[in-house]
């Protein structure tokens, strides 16, 4: 089924920044996709094209990317008469129009918007749900489908929040649930308990939420944050059923080969900065003391030695985000160096659906886990909910169970689970091996 029209416009993300929306039309109708954007972005990511005109949107406009869709991509895609169900052909055309390694000519935000809208049109052309079409494209098993464990970011630190806390995300993972719906209820109840406890201990304003819906109290250390979360889990009555995940985003506090856990203090004392092995010891202590099952970006994006050293003895899932930025070349290096055992999959880091699927399949081939992820600047687009089910990864992180741009994905997963009925299983404790269930 050919594409008759492609049109892009500038809309806004959850932080009030401009982002690209693409509408792609076939005889089945018009299909829309909105591109997200990140706050802590890896240096090896595909390029998100921003206008840089400081007189508009403080330099963050995306009119160039929008114009690239409307004036370069749209005519080429319509003229090429590609079948919208052939995602690889669509993406190959987009990549050839750009011609750069990091999509800097047209912008990853322009290319991705078209790529994702095409996949929605492809599903409609086949009269199947989007997750089924994505499973077909990935060659994934669909008997049964796997619903993911939601890693819910309930407490924020690092670059996502004020306060001295260096680590960026503290997530709860309801691995002891029987279904996705039950997991989300458990997560929601813990979240509300956490909000009440936080306000009690840190004052009413501590209940205010960060970019991803988590609370951001003025907490100094990781232990303090983890104690608060464990207390909330106990208060909700789910001890032993809810585990914890961390996203350290360590590249944000890596300075001169050391890790500065006091990086938000301009007067930080360099004699207290930690070496890679010292930071690894801190993680080991946390894993011993708390029900932590997953640690993302424990070290900086080019500190390969620290990653490999820690992975040998970690004993929990080690997720690579800034290290790999969903890039097949970086993933291959991480696999070879035994630096991690799970990929954080962000479609806008690599900038096309076909490349994202390849990144996931490369990871599965090495017995890695894959966690599908939102970005901190999100929208009402629910694509990643279908993606996590289609790819069968068994784990997703899409913020707290609060703020509509986060709930949009979680609610879509509720719908998918209901629609699949007995052809759905919940990943639960086996979230790391979702694709093998």
Curated annotation (Swiss-Prot):
Q: What is its main location?
A: cytoplasm
GO function terms (MF aspect)? magnesium ion binding; phosphopyruvate hydratase activity
Query: Where can this protein be found?
Result: Cytoplasm
Q: Could you name the active-site residues?
A: 212 (proton donor), 346 (proton acceptor)
Q: Which of UniProt's keywords are assigned here?
A: Cytoplasm, Glycolysis, Lyase, Magnesium, Metal-binding
Give the enzyme's EC designation.
4.2.1.11
One of its GO biological process terms is:
glycolytic process
Question: What's the protein called, per UniProt?
Answer: Enolase
Q: Which family does it belong to?
A: Belongs to the enolase family.
Q: Describe the protein's quaternary organization and the partners it interacts with.
A: Homodimer.
Which of this chain's residues are annotated to bind substrate? 160, 169, 296, 321, 373-376, 397
Tell me where on the tree of life, at the top rank, the source sits: Eukaryota
Give the catalytic activity. (2R)-2-phosphoglycerate = phosphoenolpyruvate + H2O
User: In the UniProt record, what gene is named as encoding this protein?
Assistant: ENO
Q: Keyword Cytoplasm, does the record have it?
A: yes
Q: What taxonomic lineage is listed for the species of origin?
A: Eukaryota, Fungi, Dikarya, Ascomycota, Saccharomycotina
Reported cofactor(s): Mg(2+)
List each coiled-coil range: none
Q: How is the cofactor bound, in the record's words?
A: Mg(2+) is required for catalysis and for stabilizing the dimer.
Q: Does the keyword Metal-binding apply?
A: yes
């Amino acid at each position: 089924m050919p594409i008759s029209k492609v049109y892009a416009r500038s809309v806004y993300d959850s932080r009030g920044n401009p982002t690209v929306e693409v509408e792609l039309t076939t005889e089945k109708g018009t299909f829309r996709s909105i591109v997200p954007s990140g706050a802590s972005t890896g240096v090896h990511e595909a390029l998100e094209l921003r206008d840089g005109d400081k007189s508009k949107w403080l330099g963050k406009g995306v009119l160039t990317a929008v114009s690239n869709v409307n004036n370069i991509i749209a005519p080429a895609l319509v003229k090429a008469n590609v079948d919208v169900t052939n995602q690889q052909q669509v993406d190959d055309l987009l990549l050839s129009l750009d011609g750069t390694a990091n999509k800097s000519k047209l912008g990853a935000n322009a290319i991705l918007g078209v790529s994702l809208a095409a996949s929605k049109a492809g599903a409609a052309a086949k009269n199947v749900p989007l997750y089924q079409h994505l499973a077909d494209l990935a060659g994934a098993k669909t008997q049964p489908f796997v619903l993911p464990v939601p890693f819910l970011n309930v407490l924020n630190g690092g670059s996502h929040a004020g306060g001295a806390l260096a680590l960026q995300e503290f997530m709860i993972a309801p691995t002891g649930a029987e279904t996705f719906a039950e997991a989300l209820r458990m997560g929601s109840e813990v979240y509300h308990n956490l909000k009440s406890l936080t306000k009690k201990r840190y004052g009413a304003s501590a209940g205010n939420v960060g970019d991803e819906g988590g609370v951001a109290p003025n907490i100094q250390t990781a232990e303090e944050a983890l104690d608060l979360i464990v207390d909330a889990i106990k208060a909700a009555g789910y001890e032993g059923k809810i585990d914890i995940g961390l996203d350290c985003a360590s590249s944000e506090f890596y300075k001169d080969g050391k890790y500065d856990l006091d990086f938000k203090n301009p007067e930080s004392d360099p004699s207290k900065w930690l070496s890679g092995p010292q930071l690894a010891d801190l993680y080991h202590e946390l894993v011993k003391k708390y029900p932590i099952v997953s640690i993302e970006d424990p070290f900086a994006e080019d500190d390969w030695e620290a990653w490999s050293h820690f992975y040998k003895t970690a004993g929990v899932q080690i997720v690579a985000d800034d290290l790999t930025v969903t890039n097949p070349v970086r993933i291959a290096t991480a696999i070879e160096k035994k630096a991690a055992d799970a990929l954080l999959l962000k479609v806008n880091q690599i900038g096309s659906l076909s490349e994202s699927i390849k990144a996931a399949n490369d990871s599965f081939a090495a017995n890695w886990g894959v966690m599908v992820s939102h970005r901190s600047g999100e929208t009402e687009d629910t694509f990643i909910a279908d993606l996590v089910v289609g790819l069968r990864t068994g784990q997703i992180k899409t913020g707290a169970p609060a703020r509509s741009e986060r709930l949009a994905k979680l609610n879509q997963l509720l719908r998918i689970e209901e629609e699949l009925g007995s052809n759905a299983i919940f990943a639960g404790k086996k979230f790391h091996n979702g694709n093998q269930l």
